[in-house]
């Protein structure tokens, strides 16, 4: 469907410039879409690897915890879980991936505190409980990393969809409209030129007959 414009040379020049810009924009957006897809696939793989590793470590820590509960007094476990484990600091900054602002989470334990994550007596403890607590402690930064990657995947997917719509709009609407309109104006101008030539010939012939 062509645009509703006057078939003039000025309009033809303007539309040709628009077509050049639209074609260049389409290529840039298509390149961006391809690169976004490439990075998105890498992130999905990373997300799956992280999730599998976390699930495996969680199962191991839970297994140790269940074993520990069977050999340690329940009151001690309840008291232990009620204790504040450790102070941590989490900062979130933004980084730019192909014009997409994604979160970058930084996790850090408070080094001013005791190096032992949980302060509890070893009288009622056992190896399974120690491993379980250590395992859950090490999971926190990995869980934050997983959250970071999953949020990045979500934002990248939204940008890919947005870019895809823009690429399709240019490819299937804007560029074809411009090309059809340019063709129409060219045909109209050629038609006008032929009509003008025919008119001049007739005028010349009329002058000759006189």
From Swiss-Prot:
GO BP annotations listed: proton motive force-driven plasma membrane ATP synthesis; sodium ion transport
InterPro entries from the UniProt entry: V_ATPase_D (IPR002699)
Keyword entries, A-Z: Ion transport, Sodium, Sodium transport, Transport
Source domain of life: Bacteria
A Pfam family that the UniProt record links to this protein: ATP-synt_D
GO MF, any single term: proton-transporting ATP synthase activity, rotational mechanism
Purpose of the protein: Involved in ATP-driven sodium extrusion.
Recorded family membership: Belongs to the V-ATPase D subunit family.
Protein's UniProt name: V-type sodium ATPase subunit D
Organism: Enterococcus hirae (strain ATCC 9790 / DSM 20160 / JCM 8729 / LMG 6399 / NBRC 3181 / NCIMB 6459 / NCDO 1258 / NCTC 12367 / WDCM 00089 / R)
């Amino acid at each position: 469907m062509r645009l509703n414009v006057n078939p003039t040379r000025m309009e033809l020049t303007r539309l040709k410039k628009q077509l050049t810009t639209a074609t260049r924009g389409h290529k840039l957006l298509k390149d961006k879409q391809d690169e976004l897809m490439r990075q998105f696939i890498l992130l999905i793989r990373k997300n799956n690897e992280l999730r599998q590793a976390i699930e495996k470590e969680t199962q191991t820590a839970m297994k140790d915890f269940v074993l520990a509960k069977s050999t340690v007094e329940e009151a001690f476990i309840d008291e232990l879980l009620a204790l504040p484990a450790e102070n941590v600091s989490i900062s979130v900054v933004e980084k730019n991936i192909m014009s997409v602002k994604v979160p970058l989470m930084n996790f850090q334990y408070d080094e001013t505190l005791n190096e032992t994550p949980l302060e509890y007596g070893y009288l009622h403890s056992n190896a399974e409980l120690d491993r379980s607590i250590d395992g859950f402690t090490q999971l926190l930064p990995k869980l934050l990393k997983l959250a970071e990657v999953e949020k990045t995947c979500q934002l990248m997917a939204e940008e890919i969809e947005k870019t895809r719509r823009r690429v399709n709009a240019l490819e299937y609407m804007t560029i074809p409209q411009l090309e059809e309109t340019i063709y129409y104006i060219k045909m109209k101008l050629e038609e006008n030129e032929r009509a003008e030539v025919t008119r001049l010939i007739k005028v010349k012939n009329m002058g000759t007959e006189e």
